Structure formats: structure tokens, C-alpha cells
Amino acid sequence: MKRRTDPECTAPLKKQKRIGELARHLSSTSDDEPLSSVNHAAKASATSLSGSDSETEGKQPCSDDFKDAFKADSLVEGTSSRYSMYNSVSQRLMAKMGFREGEGLGKYSQGRKDIVETSNQKGRRGLGLTLQGFDQELNVDWRDEPEPNACEQVSWFPECTTEIPDSREMSDWMVVGKRKMVIEDETEFCGEELLHSMLKCKSVFDILDGEEMRRARTRANPYEMIRGVFFLNRAAMKMANMDFVFDRMFTNPLDSSGKPLLKESDIDLLYFADVCAGPGGFSEYVLWRKKWHAKGFGMTLKGPNDFKLEDFYSASSELFEPYYGEGGVDGDGDITRPENINAFRNFVLDNTDRKGVHFVMADGGFSVEGQENLQEILSKQLLLCQFLMALSVVRTGGHFVCKTFDLFTPFSVGLIYLLYCCFERVCLFKPITSRPANSERYVVCKGLKVGIDDVREYLFSVNIKLNQLRNTESDVNLVVPLMVIKGDHEFNDYMIRSNESYCSLQIKALAKIHAFVQDTTLSEPRQAEIRKECLQLWKIPDQARVAPSSSDPKFKFFELIKDTDINIFSYKPTLLTAKTLEKIRPVLEYRCMVSGSEQKFLLGLGKSQIYTWDGRQSDRWVKLDLKTELPRDTLLCVEIVHELKGEGKAQRKISAIHILDVLVLNGSDVREQHFNQRIQLAEKFVKAVSKPSRPDMNPIRVKEVYRLEEMEKIFVRLEMKLIKGSGGTPKLSYTGRDDRHFVPTGVYIVRTVNEPWTMGFSKSNNRKFFYNKKTQKSVYALPTESIAPFHTCYYSRLFWEWGDGFHMRDSQKPQDPDKLSKEDVLSFIQSHNPLGP
């Protein structure tokens, strides 16, 4: 026998060591790695060594033993056994235990004969649990679904050519019958086979764990990654989606000639209502898009699903006013209560000059867990009340968008028919942001017609009847006779096509989720790509949702004024005296306002975070101790005035914010605009932020501005009134447009024309003109360079101080010879007014 150190024995040992290392490498290969990629001879060598090691533990193998083992393993590897897919190590281990193909292990071959199946365990199901009914095949080919696409098509109902039904015609339309709680036989507007197939696909998920279904749905929906972007929920992105698809008809409505109905420079706001829409995603989108150029009214059910205005991170919730029907802010917001519908309607009309809103959004829904197939029936009154609310508050020519579910029952289709009669155009639309597997779709209505009051009153009576029949065996089954609906063939055909189209898409989407539940490796590869395409198309920045950070008022002030010289804000007005009276010689260039207290700068950082500053650099911004709210990034020039209402003991006092001028409105820098335009924008801004439903809040008003040549109008508003706490001595008071009065301290006089321009009046053409004193050029149109920006108006302003030395009439003995009387100023203005007395 050769020694271990002999060359003949050492070489095979080194070879064996290399093969052993290869064996250890192969034995650690996972089941997911293809064994066939490994060289067959190397596998045989490695596994033979492993087998040899197990048989000769503690012995040193020689070259002859190795050759025999290699040969044996090669024979095993080449067999045609159905177990040949297992490596030879496994086969040899089984052979050592006495395994023979077709027999079980054990003394009497009583062991298991079949291979143990791969685990089908899914999620957190109990070990071995199978869901009877779910694991069966649906026999639906979902793979031929359309390719994901960011571009969508809209199909409108044909234009309604029939007259809007009147109360006489509708007097016998409402049909009351036995309450119906089945949907399977509703085949008037959808094929029976298609309806049953859709209901079957829905029912399959009844026994599936909700979380498991949601995970599969997330992977299956190609549009799932759009989510809510930086808004508070996905609903906001649905509105963004539909607003784009319908050519911005909500956020940028057009007139009959196709021109924008509203411009940002106009004084009119875009009014909208958001009903049954907590927490408010629709409104957050609209206010993000329009900023302070829009004002929203909202009504939704009080409780956990109320508006969450504090979560409006991307928009200013100060521009939105919830009103819950009867009782106002203390109401319950139940849209099915007739009192709430009437109260909300009156509130909206009172605050939109009796015109109504430009559009209504409704997104109502509630949990129907366990009764998903009956969602349409269970939601019928909610749907009716949302339609009724739209007809109650939308102005003529306005629009409406409302979430619906399945539309199979004649009751639901009848409601759609009434909208079809009342609006110029109507369509049923499912945006790609609405998950394809649910029944959700939206009815979109464009251009409310004149003369819909009878339909509104009819729906109001139907709602009353539904309330009366609640908790009984009877129900309103029809609001429009089937004969009338089917008599309009174009409407009927569209309704059937729409239902069957959405049914088919929903069936495929449900089957796809079913497949994704069964195979957890399936996923939609283009989700990120589609998301990017959609956001670009809808002009939504791809940004994360981040809560607004709190700002230091001084830092925010410098951020808003940019590079403006800080010294401008410390300028005090020039006092109007006999010596400075000549400054107002160009009368047409000036405007004037009545003052009630000291002027301050007011900075809004959002909600009640409001600070004031008197303009001196040595002083700090001080928190305003008033109950009011302003949108963030707002900078105003104001007075805090003590307003009075009534006289004597019943007199009430309230502190109000009076706006003298505006610099920045909710991030919009308006300092370079004309003073008249700035005041108009201030009035628009105040309408947007005012809260008529909150009498507990301190009001915000814009100073009433007069032309200097019309200053005598101010004195018409002045009278002597008894002021509580003044010792019974009447004081001079100025009464504003809102019937509240305050003690005036003087008049601000503001120049609106920039040097070297001045204003004149052409008697031959009977119109004003602008004259450049340097170039001696005259023009009628307002030159841009003649507009005095805020800083010019501010440092050049004059102040006619009244105080104790002011006297209204010449008969009054002057107490201060340096102070000008009413007669002094008015006579000077009249003598220099080119328009004449």
C-alpha cells in the first residue's frame, strides 16, 4: 500500500478536493436556479463525492473508490425515472433509506408514494385553507384588455330634442310599489348574460380576505400608481383627470362664443359647490388650480367623513365654506333632509348674487360591505338628492359632475333621463383614475337650461316620499315611466351601450384581479410610465405630499417683498395742510378713503396665523388678536377699526379689518398693478375669504374708494351719533356700505399716476387723457408706464387729518388754524376739477 505522501495518491486527492468544493456549491443552489446550466459531468462528479463522503465517514478514499462512485452516479443520472429531475444526491439519500419507485418508505412500504405538492399558501390564510368557489376558473379572457393609455375619449348622449317636462306632465310619473332588493332581473338596460356574468365575478370576491384582494388590485391596475400625488386623497386626482378630459370646463368655463367666462383680472369669482364630498379632495384640486379666484361652498354629513380642511396642504381651505343645511355650521349635513336642501340652496343663492354656482361636484357614497351587488339600490336616494341639489344651486349655463354606480334599474335611468332633459349635453364617463374593477362612473352635465324649476320641485317631492317610505315594505320604483324612456330611442340606445360597455370592462378587470390573486408573480409593468404620462398631460407636478411648514413672519415678509427697499414701509403720509394743498392740484389723478385708525401691514401665514407690523424696522411682527382667517402668503395694508352698530345701550362694537391696499394675495404679487385694479382684486379676495355662516369671526372689508373730484360723497355719509362710553356727547361718525359706522380720523388721498405722467380732460372729445410732461405726448389709452405701483402710491400718499380741530361748517369756530375745513378742501378741488362742478 502506498503512503499518503506518494505522488500517485496525492494527485487524486487534490482532484477529489476540487470536486468536493464543486459539490458543496451545487448542493446550495436554490430551486429557482436552473440546474441544467451546470455541466453534467461536473454534477455527477460532485454528487458522487458527496455520496462517498457519507458512506466512508472518517476514512480516506482512494482513487479506485472514487472511480466506482462516479460510475454508479452516472448510471443513476441517466435513468428514465420520473424522479430524474432531482439531483443524484437526493436520489442516493432516498436509496439508502430503501426507497423504490412506486412504493412507500417503511418496513411494509406504507409511506407516501406521491410527491409532496408545492405549497399554495397565500397571504395570511390559515395553513392549508382553500376558498371554495374562489379558486375555480372564471373563464374570462382578461389578457385582451386595451393597452393602458393616458388619452381618453368621451361619448355624449345625443342632444335632447324634447321639451323639459313640466309639473303637469310629471304629475303621475312617480310609481310606488313593493321594495325591491334584487338586481339580477334588471335587464331593461343591459343584456341578461352580461349582467349575470358581472354579478358572478363580483360575488367571487365575497369570500376573499380584503387585504389580499387589495394587494392584487394594486398590482393589476395599470393606473394605480397615480394615487393622490400631493393632494389629500385619490378623489382630487379624479377631478383633475375629468377636468382635463372635459377641456377644463369646470375650472375654466367658456361662454357661448367659446371665450373664457372668467378672467383672473375680473372681479367675479368662480363659484362652486361640493356636496357629499368629505374629506374634500375635489375642492382641494379646484382651489389648487384656481387659488383665490374661486370660492367653494360645501355640504356633507357631519362625523368621521366630514371635510378635513386642515389637510388641504396644496390649497387654501380659507376659500372654502362648509354649510350643513338647517342650523348652518351646527347642522348635520344630511342631504336627504328637505330642510337641509332648502337651507343650503338659500345660503348659496344669498352669497352668489342670487345666481347660483358655476358648477356642482358630488362624490357621495357609503360602505355597502357584504352587499356590493345591491349598491345601486341602496344608494338610490343619495343619488336623487345629489341631482336635486345640483338643480337647486347651479346657475343657468352651469355644469354638474356626480358619482354614480351601476345604472341598471329604471329608477336610476329615470334620474339620468331628467338630467338629460335639463342640461344641454350629458354623458356617462369613467375616468382612468377610477379603478376599472368597481362600478363607479360619473355623470357629467354641461350647460343647465332655463326652465328646470318644475323638475327640481318634482325631485323634491320624490325625496319627501322616499323619506316617508323609509323602513317600510314600499318604495318609489319609478320616477320616469319606462314608456317615456324607451320612447326616446337615442337615449335608450346610449344607455344600453354604456351599461354593457362598462359591464364588459368590469368583468375583465375583476377576472384580472382574480388571476393576480392566484398568481402573486403577476404585475403591470407600465404603472410608473403611465403615471408620468398622465401627470404631464393633466399638468399636475410630480411632487410629494408635504405639510406646509410654519414660517417666521419676518422671514416670510422679506420673501414676499423680494428686493424692495425696506425703508419704503416706514414712510409716513404727508399731512394735507394749507401749505401742501397744491399737491392735489391734478385732481383726476387721486383717490381717497376714510380712515378709522392707524395704518398697519398685515401678513397672513394661513388660517389664524396673522401678524401685524407698523412699518418701523425697530418693531416686530405681532400676532393679531382677532378671530379671522387668511390664506397663506398674503400681505395687506390695513387698519383695525372698531365698528359700531346701533346707538345707546343696544350699541354693539366689533373689530374689523379694513383693507387700504394690497401687495400680495395668496402668493400673487399685485403691487405693479393700477391702484384701481388692486382695490378690485382686494374686493374679489374678500368675497373669497368671507364667511357669512360665521358671525363669530371678525369681518374683513375693503375701504370704500372715492374719486377725489367726488369727495363730497363722503360727507353725505357723516353724521353725529351717540357713542357708548363717550359721556353722552355725540361724535362724528362715518357709515359704511354695510350699515356699520365708526369714528373717522381723517381721509387718505392716494395718487394713482406715475411721474412724469399726469391726467387731463379734453372738452372737445369729452374724455380723459394722459399727458407726459417730459415728452409732451398725449394719449387716451392708459400707458403702462403711467401706472403708479404700490410703493409709489404708498410713499406719495397724503393724509387729511380731522381730529378735534376739524370743523364741518364755517359756522363752527376753528380750534386749529393749521387744519383745513371741509369748505377749504372742497372748494380747492372744485376750482381745479377739469370736469367742472
Curated annotation (Swiss-Prot):
Stretch list, region Interaction with POLR2A: 726-834
Ranges of residues in domain RrmJ-type SAM-dependent 2'-O-MTase: 230-449
Keyword annotations of the record: Acetylation, Methyltransferase, mRNA capping, mRNA processing, Nucleus, Phosphoprotein, S-adenosyl-L-methionine, Transferase
Subunit organization: Interacts with POLR2A (via C-terminus).
The reaction(s) this protein catalyses: a 5'-end (N(7)-methyl 5'-triphosphoguanosine)-ribonucleoside in mRNA + S-adenosyl-L-methionine = a 5'-end (N(7)-methyl 5'-triphosphoguanosine)-(2'-O-methyl-ribonucleoside) in mRNA + S-adenosyl-L-homocysteine + H(+)
Biological process annotations from GO: 7-methylguanosine mRNA capping; methylation; mRNA processing
GO molecular function: mRNA (nucleoside-2'-O-)-methyltransferase activity; nucleic acid binding
Sequence motif: Bipartite nuclear localization signal, positions: 2-18
Xref: SUPFAM superfamilies: S-adenosyl-L-methionine-dependent methyltransferases (SSF53335)
Record InterPro entries: G_patch_dom, mRNA_Cap_2O-Ribose_MeTrfase, RNA_MeTrfase_FtsJ_dom, RrmJ-type_MeTrfase, SAM-dependent_MTases_sf, WW_dom
G-patch domain mapped to chain residues: 86-132
Protein name as it appears in the record: Cap-specific mRNA (nucleoside-2'-O-)-methyltransferase 1
Organism of provenance: Mus musculus
Basic and acidic residues bias locations: 56-66
